[in-house]
Amino acid sequence: MTDIVILDGARTAIGTFGGSLAGTTPIELGTVAAKAALERSGVEGAQIGHVVFGHVINTEPRDMYLSRVAAMQAGIPDTTPAMNVNRLCGSGAQAIVSVVQSLMLGDADFGLAGGAECMSRSPYIIQDQRWGAKMGDIRTLDMMLGALNCPFGTGHMGVTAENVAAEHDITRAAQDEFAMTSQTRAAAAIADGRFASQITPVMVKQKRDMVPFDTDEHPKATTLDALGGLRPVFQKDGSVTAGNASGINDGAAAIVMARADAAAKAGLKPRARVLGYAHAGVRPEVMGIGPVPAVENLLAKTGLSITDFDVIESNEAFAAQALAVNKGLGLDSARVNPNGGAIALGHPVGATGAIITIKTLYELERIGGGKGLITMCIGGGQGIAIAIETL
């Protein structure tokens, strides 16, 4: 595999549903992240040869070409092509893979990958409005809930988590303990300032003033007793609750990548290189187990072992599926999501893959680690995995 390197990246803080970023469009979030990534990397906008952004839920017509608008607003010229990718939960990770592929093929020397999502701005649509209804009620559809439902009829993604819990013997107690660990680790990371260098602030309106939003706001102070007292959401006698599931969130991230030879020629020092990537498909009704075959495919392609990774960011769509993935891959829980995951920090669906890649890079450097693994389950029954190594 041609050496593809990561020069630098940045993410916004993650906003909670209806929270600080609810008034900010995904294009603006993507623009903020892209500008910061370019500035940190030392790459000029004119050097970027290809842009790919993950994005799932269009909130306005311009979002249909979010990547193009964000890129140009960030200072990338109109001669540089851009595209959106939608691999649902894996969109931000797929954006990275797509840029890697473009660079490997020699289509560009430098690329920008990222993701942007503002789930708070998800629209309602009226499908019958264009051609009219002859009589009767007209129903509106919530596009956010639509994105969170299985396209094959299983129902909400939470039902797929219940299925995974049943198939892999994941108890309610284990899920709540996992959720508590996520909250505890995230709170410790924020208090210790571990995310500060990753985050670029977003200016948001607060009353009459514009203030910087620069701290993840989704984590909640809780206890095991409080988590244990929550009712199951998706099945009457189920185990998946609002407390052991990921959030509905807003945020963005961007990463500048390059061919190693192009970076060296430009006198730029990369922070990491991409070791490989892989995808997999699984039964849609147990979509949460997707990272297991995806990571297995990655290991087979690269010759790596699961024990080679010092930091593993395994997206916490639900505690049930995250635990099943840990179990299926034999992961060391101490290395998985050391600074908390999506249960605590949130899951801005199209951006999360890029966000957790940045988290992995910064944490590897903080602890002096070498290799990192990023993996995610994907609604509809898929998994994606990326391996990186610090330089």
Name each region found by the language model:
Residues 87-117, 165-194, 254-261, 326, ...:
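Active-site-proximal alpha-helical scaffold in enzymes
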Residues 160-162, 195-198, 205-206, 275-344:
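Active-site pocket-lining segment
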